[in-house]
């Protein structure tokens, strides 16, 4: 399969990259769209020393499992679900996690990606594929609101240099 592979600070389109073999509990996804994120650009500059296929914002078709044949998007953190952090309800902070296209797990800048089935969400027919690729960045912003309730009349400050 074709894939955009990062090694050090250089990346190449690889025409014969190995198609992922899903681990138990994972589903093979045929990627339809993948979005470029500021994190991808930082990884190309050497951030976190990632080597592999970039890309964590995606929409694709599930090849197997309960979503077989459906368009899906996926959460990027692949948690262990065994540690105290996961069991306490904070799997996105799992110290043993891999992260699609960022940390220890090939991402979506390829024809196929393997993703834990529990990370997948079906895309409703009312949402186009071009719109669905933005689910991950919108969900990342929304996650902040879930972690900290902001009530009417309170002030907040937003810091950071991300693209959202």
Please report, for each region that a protein language model flagged, where it lies by residue.
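Nucleotide donor/acceptor-binding cores
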Residues: 1, 70, 153-154
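Cytochrome P450 core scaffold surrounding the K-helix E-X-X-R motif
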Residues: 39-43
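Conserved Rossmann-like nucleotide-cofactor binding loop
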Residues: 37, 164
């Amino acid at each position: 399969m074709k894939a955009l592979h990062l090694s050090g600070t250089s990346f190449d389109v690889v025409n014969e990259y190995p198609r992922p073999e899903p681990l138990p509990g994972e589903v093979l996804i045929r990627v339809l769209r993948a979005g470029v994120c500021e994190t991808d650009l930082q990884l190309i500059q050497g951030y976190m020393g990632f080597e592999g296929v970039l890309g964590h914002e995606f929409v694709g078709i599930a090849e197997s499992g309960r979503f077989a044949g459906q368009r899906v998007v996926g959460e990027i953190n692949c948690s262990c679900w065994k540690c105290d952090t996961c069991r306490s309800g904070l799997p996105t902070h799992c110290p043993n996690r891999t992260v699609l296209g960022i940390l220890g797990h090939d991402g979506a800048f390829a024809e196929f990606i393997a993703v834990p089935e529990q990370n997948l969400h079906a895309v409703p027919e009312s949402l186009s594929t071009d719109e669905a690729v933005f689910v991950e960045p919108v969900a990342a912003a929304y996650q902040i609101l879930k972690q900290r309730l902001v009530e009417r009349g309170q002030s907040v400050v937003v810091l950071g240099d991300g693209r959202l």
